[in-house]
Amino acid sequence: MTQGSRLYFAVAVLMCGFVSINGVGLNDLLERASQLSDKLHSLSTSLTNDLDSHFPPVGRVMMPRPSMCHTSSLQIPNDKDQALKVPEDELLSLARSLLLAWSDPLALLSSEASSLAHPERNTIDSKTKELQDNINSLGAGLEHVFNKMDSTSDNLSSLPFDINSLGQDKTSRLVNFHFLLSCFRRDSHKIDSFLKVLRCRAAKKRPEMC
């Protein structure tokens, strides 16, 4: 079994785990969510490596700054120590807000991947569709976590994404695809970190053990 196949199988198992959710405790829900968010970050890293294997030098010059990511306006903890000070319901809202913010961008990436000017476009196309499917599964799982936590706050931030094209020429499209993916990879790491803090708190571990 290849690395990609193992990753796909692991994520598929986790997705199935969210289907039969009745009677599952909060600790187990957060464990499943943390595992899935970890797989998503691994998949986005693998995709980035695929793109980097044949990325034009001019693309590095054309790449927008990270501050141009559409989620950069969201005020979030910068590290684990800060995240440990954020209330549980607020931390969950941040993770859910980031997931929702990637619904449209991932749909755009999924629609563009198969026509990229890149020799690995078939692999990139397949992995991008996996990302889109799996982030939807994680979003559904976090809805169950929200309900299980009996939170009174459902304050989700709106992070609009108004782009419907990656560009007209092949280089621009490849650069913008890479840029969006780099933004997602950054955000998937944040989501993974937030969920691991929530999992640690649910297990009543000491902060220094998280």
Curated annotation (Swiss-Prot):
Alphabetized GO MF terms: hormone activity
Protein's UniProt keywords contain Disulfide bond: yes
Record's signal peptide: 1-23
Keywords per UniProt: Disulfide bond, Hormone, Secreted, Signal
InterPro entries: 4_helix_cytokine-like_core, Somatotropin/Prolactin, Somatotropin_CS
Protein name: Prolactin
PANTHER family in alphabetical order: PROLACTIN, SOMATOTROPIN,PROLACTIN
Distribution of this protein across tissues and organs: Pituitary gland.
Gene field: prl1
Cell compartment(s), UniProt: Secreted
GO CC terms, sorted: extracellular space
Intrachain S-S bonds: C69-C183, C200-C210
The family this protein is said to belong to: Belongs to the somatotropin/prolactin family.
Record keyword Signal present: yes
Biological process per Gene Ontology, one example term: response to nutrient levels
